[in-house]
Design a protein with these regions (language model features):
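N-terminal acidic, glycine/proline-rich low-complexity segments
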Residues: 1-451, 474
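Surface-exposed, flexible coil segments in extracellular/virion-facing regions
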Residues: 443-466
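Short, surface-exposed loop/turn segments at beta-strand-coil junctions that are enriched for proline
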Residues: 466-473, 486
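Exposed beta-strand face motif in extracellular beta-rich ectodomains
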Residues: 473-479
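Short, solvent-exposed loop/turn segments at the edges of extracellular beta-sandwich modules
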Residues: 484-490
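Extracellular and select intracellular beta-sandwich modules with Ser/Thr-enriched
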Residues: 490-497
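Extracellular interdomain linker/stem segments of modular secreted and single-pass surface proteins
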Residues: 500-504
Length: 504
């Protein structure tokens, strides 16, 4: 089955976990139609205009923690910042290997042509166009079919400026109503919080119909993931796992950031002590660093806090990008398309636990108090997949690496069934490497039917599902066929069937 490749734009600031997320993201470029790789600013990173202009927004980190460092000309932005260029150049070095394992990887020059600088000068400034905002504007207005997914790994000012320039051009024209409807149908925003307040102050008031997907329940890919990791996830966050599966794997692995690696995104950054090894929290504080997360072992997981914005886009068969509530390796939607607002700027709690809490961590905590069904733990599968793709990047021969199994549910993937009915479903699995493949049918409780369904033989390719007698017409049941091979690392793929209950 041919996998749809969602159109996606990444906007990112030079936070070190954005760097890490970008490495993983490009390893999934085979599954995606990447339309933009855009430098963005945020409250945590902005370049200044190079003209001596000073900037200040009350309540930001430069005036918390007892600091009084701004107004200032720039904040935590390296001169000649090029982390996106660096990762794409590393991708170019390994592209010949990657395309051996999946021919859909885009050529490096295609990715390089998508790089732009957005509204990077000042935190939250949407007063003028930038190359990045111009690219986003053109993509929003084009006539290509399907949704356009726009991530915000940093602030949303570049996205806001693109929308504002559309508003300024068309607001008083006869085309305005049609353009607003088109954009509402087309654009899906995928934020890592509102890191410069431009969603709250401009996008939401002026474009309330744009879908705004925020996720909960998914794997915690953020800073401090190891602090509360489940026992089954903890091994994938250790220094030994990171070294073997990430750091020692070629040019992309070499750019990946871990604790105590000797690197710093911006020289002299008092917030970034992650590259220093051999110091205690108290020693780092005496050295002038703002220690907002406890020191971890050298080489351990540092963070990929923006993964939740794109991990549902991957071609693993869950089709989680089709609807926010479908759920996948990035989590499931918090609520409605215009769900809760979450701003990283609102918390004045500077404790390690509070400061390390990403949107994904917050979402996990929110769900513990809710009535929703438990969410599957996808972290091991996601880490295995990441490891396998990094292995591809350094492996020129197809037979020297593992590849994901193929899984297919025969017939339509959306069917009708009546309450009390027994339906037979047939799956087929295979493996390109000749590995053994284990099968598991399971109910993904993201449908509107709240109860459990009975699956007769969950570990066979063919099985029967009994629709419960209390199912009501119009309710949905999501059934997953999961296939995992026994290669190294083991890789998992899925297919999702949606059963719609007939009206009686």
């Amino acid at each position: 089955m041919k996998q749809e490749r969602p159109r996606i734009i990444v906007t990112a600031d030079p936070e070190l976990d954005d760097n890490n997320s970008l490495i993983r993201f490009l390893l999934y470029s085979s599954d995606l139609n990447i339309e933009g790789l855009i430098y963005a600013s945020s409250q945590f990173h902005w370049s200044g205009d190079g003209k001596g202009t000073k900037w200040f927004v009350p309540g930001r980190e430069y005036n918390r923690f007892g600091l009084n460092l701004c107004p200032c000309e720039s904040w935590r932005w390296a001169k000649n910042e090029r982390f996106i260029h660096d990762v794409v150049e590393a991708y170019a070095k390994v592209y010949p290997n990657l395309k051996v394992h999946n021919p859909n990887y885009p050529a490096p020059n295609v990715l390089q042509s998508k790089i732009r600088f957005g509204n990077i000068e000042f935190d939250g400034d949407i007063s003028k166009n930038s190359p990045g905002s111009a690219l986003i504007k053109s993509l929003i207005l084009d006539d290509k079919p399907g949704p356009l997914f726009i991530t915000a790994w940093g602030g949303q000012s570049t996205i806001a400026r693109a929308l504002k320039s559309i508003q300024e051009q068309y607001e008083f024209s006869t085309e305005w109503e049609a353009i607003k409807k088109k954009i509402a149908r087309k654009v899906v925003l995928l934020p890592s919080g509102d890191q410069d307040d431009t969603y709250a102050t401009y996008i939401k008031p002026n474009w309330p119909m744009i879908e705004y997907r925020q996720f909960r329940d998914g794997p915690n890919y953020a800073y401090g993931a190891q602090l509360g990791a489940k026992p089954e996830n903890a091994p994938y966050l250790t220094a030994s796992w990171m070294k073997e599966n990430v750091l020692d794997r070629g040019p992309l692995g070499a750019l990946y950031r871990t604790w105590g690696d000797g690197k710093q995104m911006v020289k002299g950054d008092i917030m970034d002590y992650f590259g220093l090894a051999g110091y205690t929290n108290e020693e780092l504080k005496k050295m002038g660093y703002v220690v907002w997360m406890p020191v971890q072992p050298k080489g351990a997981w540092l963070g990929e806090g923006d993964n939740h914005t794109f991990m549902n886009m991957t071609g693993n068969g869950l089709r989680a990008y089709e609807r926010g509530f479908y759920g996948g390796w990035g989590g499931r939607e918090i609520g409605s398309g215009n769900g809760m607002d979450f701003s990283l700027s609102t918390s004045q709690d500077t404790s390690a636990n509070a400061m390390a809490m990403s949107l994904s961590t917050l979402n996990n905590q929110l769900n513990k108090t809710g009535k929703n069904a438990p969410y599957p733990n996808f972290f091991p599968q996601a880490q295995h997949d990441f490891s396998a793709r990094l292995k591809w990047s350094v492996t020129p021969k197809y037979t020297d690496a593992n590849h994901e199994p193929t899984v297919k549910i025969e017939g339509p993937l959306t069917i009708l069934a009546s309450a009390g009915e027994k339906i037979r479903v047939n799956g087929a699995v295979s493996d390109p490497d000749g590995n053994a493949v284990s099968i598991n049918w399971w109910q993904f409780q993201v449908g509107t039917y709240p109860g459990k369904v009975m699956i007769s033989t969950p570990n066979s390719a063919q099985t029967e599902v009994i629709i419960p007698n209390d199912a009501v017409g119009g309710q949905t049941i999501h059934l997953i066929l999961e296939a995992t091979d026994n290669g190294t690392p083991s890789l998992t793929r899925y297919q999702r069937m949606i059963i719609m209950v007939r009206n009686k």
